[in-house]
Structures are given as structure tokens and as C-alpha cells.
From Swiss-Prot:
This is Guanylate kinase. It catalyses: GMP + ATP = GDP + ADP. InterPro entries: GK/Ca_channel_bsu (IPR008145), Guanylate_kin-like_dom (IPR008144), Guanylate_kinase (IPR017665), Guanylate_kinase_CS (IPR020590), P-loop_NTPase (IPR027417). GO terms for molecular function: ATP binding; guanylate kinase activity. Keywords: ATP-binding, Cytoplasm, Kinase, Nucleotide-binding, Transferase. HAMAP family: Guanylate_kinase (MF_00328). SUPFAM superfamilies: P-loop containing nucleoside triphosphate hydrolases. Belongs to the guanylate kinase family.
Length: 220
């Protein structure tokens, strides 16, 4: 039956927490950016970090760059949903904007490492959809880091050493995507998001919809 006003049926749902992790250079930031550009119901959870800003990064868009003292204040005040130390720098997710967005039905995207993903799953498992992105080879991973041309040789070496330990955590994620083709990897993540949005336990408005559906008596 077509609605009288020709508008689609809207069923309220709680937003989900889409966690994307990978070793540096595996493509998570590119995929996350493409997802944000295409899907307007997804917002990026902007982390705070004590890491120095790269030339290509914009304050408030990529990260909120703060001092170690301010980070410790937020952490100790329970203002962070998760936090981690990565490559000698601290990263964390502010609690308030995430909870407000999800309550309004918006999905939040988290570009974080396995430590942060683990904390989010411990605290808010029902809301989390976690995806780990793998590179096709370690040689390709190294090439991507060099092509990025944003880090020194010493930093690249550290990232490559840490990448093996990060990859060991692939089993802790709900989904695993092999990024040997960027478009195919992106389409795989799109499919995951679409499926997760229609899970029964996320659509709290479904109960009212089904009740009204059963109460409806079409005129013959």
C-alpha cells in the first residue's frame, strides 16, 4: 500500500558506532573520507590527540590537537569514551558529541586503532560495528607509507614495525576487508553499513510501526 502523501516510511533507530582500524598505510583514512563524502548520515568522531599536526591536517577536522595536560584532564574526568597511546602520542574520543549524535539517529565513524576499538566494544558493544582493513602485502604497505610523504624514514620504520602487532588483532573485529582494490574495499564497507542499519535491535521505532501496522484495517 502506497502512503497517501507518497513519502517513505521512516522508522526511528539509534545511531551506530562504525569503527574502522588498520595499520598505517592500509587505507582506512581514504576509505573513511570517501564514506563521509557519500553518506550524509555518517559523521566523523573527531579525536583529540597530543600528536603534532601534519601539514595536510586541519584542526577540528582531522583531530583536535591538545596538550598532554589537557588530555590527562579529560581522561581523568571520564570525558573520553576511549583513549590509547600510539607511537608515543595519546589519542582519545570525546564522549559528549558521540552520545548526542547517536541518540539523534546519526551514525558515528571512528578512525581508531585496536586499543581504542577494544575499549569501545567493552563499554558499548551493542552499538559498535568494527571493521579491520588489511593491506595485500607488507611490501605494498611500505610503498604506501613512502608515497604518502608525510613522515620521516624513522617514523615510517616505526610504523612498519608496529603494523605486524596491529594486524595480530584482526580476529577481534566483526568484519575484515582486504584492501587490494580501493573501490572494492569501499563497496564492501558500504554493504556492511547498510546491513547493520536494518538490524532489529537498532530500530527501536520498529515496535511502534509493527503495532500500528497490525492495528490497520484496510478498506475493502
Amino acid at each position: 500500500m502506497v502512503p497517501v502523501n507518497n513519502s517513505p516510511v521512516t522508522i526511528a533507530r539509534r545511531g551506530l558506532m562504525l569503527v574502522i582500524s588498520s595499520p598505517s598505510g592500509a587505507g582506512k583514512s581514504t576509505i573513511a573520507r570517501n564514506l563521509l563524502e557519500k553518506d550524509k548520515n555518517i559523521s566523523l568522531s573527531v579525536s583529540v590527540t597530543t600528536r603534532p599536526r601534519r601539514q595536510s591536517e586541519i584542526e577540528g577536522i582531522h583531530y583536535h590537537f591538545i596538550s598532554k595536560r589537557d588530555f590527562e584532564r579529560m581522561r581523568d574526568g571520564d570525558e573520553l569514551l576511549e583513549w590509547a597511546e600510539v607511537h608515543g602520542n595519546f589519542y582519545g574520543t570525546p564522549r559528549e558529541p558521540v552520545e548526542a549524535a547517536m541518540a539523534a539517529g546519526r551514525d558515528m565513524l571512528f578512525d581508531i586503532d585496536w586499543q581504542g576499538a577494544e575499549q569501545l566494544q567493552d563499554k558499548m558493544k551493542a552499538d559498535v560495528v568494527s571493521i579491520f582493513i588489511l593491506p595485500p602485502t607488507m611490501t605494498e604497505l611500505q610503498s604506501r607509507l613512502h608515497r604518502r610523504a608525510e613522515d620521516s624514514e624513522e617514523v615510517i620504520k616505526t610504523r612498519l614495525l608496529n603494523s605486524r602487532a596491529e594486524i595480530e588483532h584482526w580476529r577481534d573485529y566483526d568484519y575484515v576487508i582486504l584492501n587490494d582494490d580501493l573501490q572494492a574495499a569501499f563497496e564492501g564497507i558500504e554493504a556492511i553499513v547498510k546491513a547493520e542499519r536494518v538490524r532489529r535491535d537498532r530500530r527501536h521505532g520498529m515496535f511502534d510501526f509493527v503495532r500500528s501496522l497490525l492495528e490497520e484495517e484496510p478498506k475493502l
